[in-house]
Structures are given as structure tokens and as C-alpha cells.
């Protein structure tokens, strides 16, 4: 019985990692080019949101590669905060918002089609 329980937990963790990775990579392919400087736009609105967040980054990877990884690192957390807040602790939610509030508001302003995550 314990093996089955552990296998189920392992499978849930694997599925979460896969979903998070797919969101991260999909952000690279569908969003990056429109919001970073030197791509389709000058990135001014994104840069403004980042500066209003006092240069705080959600991960060292995002901090080290801000015009390549910041959006992709944030997007799974954005989905969690906006569409599945019951799946994260209030402490985690507060940490995400305290570091990225302006970026999250920027993503909200884009009116992205997130119907996949809505009931």
C-alpha cells in the first residue's frame, strides 16, 4: 500500500514539473518576442514594470538572464497566483506578489487568453 501511495505522490510531482516546464517554454515561444527589448517591441512597458518591482527577481535564473528568462520564470507563478490560489500557501502568494506585483499587473493588462485555466 505504501508503494502505491508513494508512486502516486511521485507521479503528481512529475506532472507538476511537466506542466510548469511547458508553461515556461511556451512563454519563450509565444510571449518573449513581444515584451523584451530588441525584439518585436522596445520592451519599455516590461522594463517599467521590472523597475517598479525594485529589480526584484523571482529566481536567480531570471535575475541572471533578465531579457531571456524573467517572463518564463514568472509565468507558472502568475498562473498559480491568478488561477489556482488555493493550490499555493498564502505565504508563497505573498512572496510572489511582493517581488513581482507590477509584472503581474502588466501581465493582467495584456488580456492574454487564459481560458484554459478558467472554469
Regions found by a protein language model. Give the residues of each.
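Active-site scaffold of zinc-dependent metalloenzymes
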Residues: 1-19
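Mature, folded catalytic cores of secreted/periplasmic enzymes
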Residues: 6-10, 24-29, 53-54
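Soluble non-cytosolic domains of exported or imported proteins
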Residues: 13-17, 21, 62-67
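Active-site recognition of the HExxH zinc-binding catalytic motif
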Residues: 16-35, 72
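A structural motif
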Residues: 30-50
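Metalloprotease/metallohydrolase-associated module, dominated by Zn2+-dependent proteases
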Residues: 44-119
